[in-house]
Each structure stands twice: as C-alpha cells, then as structure tokens.
Amino acid sequence: MRILVSNDDGVHAEGIRALSEALTACGEVIVVAPDRNRSGASHSLTLEVPLRVTRLGETGFNGSESYAVKGTPTDCVHLAVNELVRPEPDMVVAGINHGANLGDDVIYSGTVAAATEGRHLGFPSLAISLVGKTHFATAAHYAAQLVKGMMVHPLPADQILNVNVPDLPLDQIKGIRVTRLGNRHRAESVICSEDPRGQPIYWIGPPGSQQDAGEGTDFAAIEQGYVSITPLTIDMTAYSSLAGLGAWLDLQG
C-alpha cells in the first residue's frame, strides 16, 4: 500500500508530520505538500507560473520520501499523481489540518480540496482535521484506523471522507459519529486598515458563527466530544432540482 500525504498548512507543519508517521504502520508513505501555509486555497490550480519542487528526502518524516511544492494543495496532489510518485499511490490522505473543517468550511479548505483531487484522479481519499492545535496524536490515531478500514472496504468511487477530530486526549474521545455538514452564518466583516503610507488594506474576517449545528451535524458531534465523519460527493449536481428547473425554464417561454 502506497499512501500519498498532503495538506494545506505546509510541509513543515506539525499535523502532516504526525499523520505521515502514523500512516507508516499502514504502508509506504510519500509526502508531497506546499512549501508554505496555503490554508483557504480551496481547489485552485497554479496555471500562470511553473511549479517548483524541492526534494526534502526523508528528513523529519520518519523515513518517508518527501517533497515541497511551491503551489497549492491541489497542485501537490495533481503533480504527485501525474509525475512525482512512481509507481502511483493507492490512496490519498490530506491533513492533519490545524483547525476545523466543519460545515461550509469545506468550500474553502485546501485540505479537503487535496483529498477531492485525489478522488477526482481515481484514488480513495480522506481529509482529516484537528479542531485545535494540540492533540495531533489523537487525530493521527483515527487517520490510521480509517486508512486500515479503507484498505479492506474501499469507499464508493464518488466519495471522500471529511473527518474532524476534537482536540482532546485519545482516552477522552467518546466515539465516532457519521454526520452531515452543518452551516455557518455569513462571515464576519472585512477588517479595514491602512499601510504605513496611508493606503487602504483589507483582511478577510473570521468565519461566521454556527447557524445549523443541530443534532446530526458535524458541529454537534465535535461539541459533544465525538469524531465526526462526513461523506462528501464529488458530483455536485443538484439532482432533486433537475425536473423543477426544467419546468421553470418552460415558464420563461
């Protein structure tokens, strides 16, 4: 089993190191990740400039081959599968993200996008995030457990798993729940300021607070001390709307 590991926090982040070390118990691990933090990159590809790659060898990854890419998480997986990793990997695992990817966070997440790219290219994939920045060993434990399960019982071809783990010691986790995505309120206002020359500058504000966080959501599972696993589909077609949209178009004449 050859496992491609990537992330969006960068190749030197604590989370990807904990993940790659844990997954060596499951097979051969190859790390291909951004050379810096690319959080919020979503599913973007770099098209206007060439991608530059630095081979890091086996430094800091428990003997695993590793590469730093000057690009996005999606670039990393795309480049790894199509060029860098030979023979091809059998699975793609993204994370461990430094912070939650709950609800509509998945739209912006480079971690989820890396897993999605893996699935798009034909490989079983999962994204794993720690809802905090302390207990990476807990998230790594569940990542290894899920990878072992996927080796025996592969996922459906059109799905990835989005996994969120409470920032708790392993013995304080209550269990695992299968969840749906919750939802947040509209993001908070943009933060406006000035640079030293008096020119306006802007910072994207923090995400909105929880809106749909009821029972059955990923938000609720985390709040109650459970690992949340949400299956995400690659096909974004709103099948339930096809007939209604056709009828609406008929009304337009």
UniProtKB/Swiss-Prot annotation:
Cofactors (names): a divalent metal cation
UniProt keyword RNA-binding present: no
Binding site for a divalent metal cation: D8, D9, S39, N97
Cofactor: binding details: Binds 1 divalent metal cation per subunit.
Record keywords, A-Z: Cytoplasm, Hydrolase, Metal-binding, Nucleotide-binding
Annotated catalysed reactions: a ribonucleoside 5'-phosphate + H2O = a ribonucleoside + phosphate
Chief localisation class: cytoplasm
Keyword Nucleotide-binding (UniProt): yes
Pfam families listed in its UniProt record: SurE
Signal sequence interval, chain numbering: none
Annotated InterPro entries: SurE, SurE-like_Pase/nucleotidase, SurE-like_sf
Superkingdom assignment: Bacteria
This enzyme's EC code(s): 3.1.3.5
GO molecular function, one term: metal ion binding
GO cellular component terms, semicolon-separated: cytoplasm
Location of the protein in the cell: Cytoplasm
Function summary: Nucleotidase that shows phosphatase activity on nucleoside 5'-monophosphates.
Family statement drawn from the similarity comment of this UniProt entry: Belongs to the SurE nucleotidase family.
Name under which the protein is recorded: 5'-nucleotidase SurE
Organism: Aeromonas hydrophila subsp. hydrophila (strain ATCC 7966 / DSM 30187 / BCRC 13018 / CCUG 14551 / JCM 1027 / KCTC 2358 / NCIMB 9240 / NCTC 8049)
Gene, per the UniProt record: surE
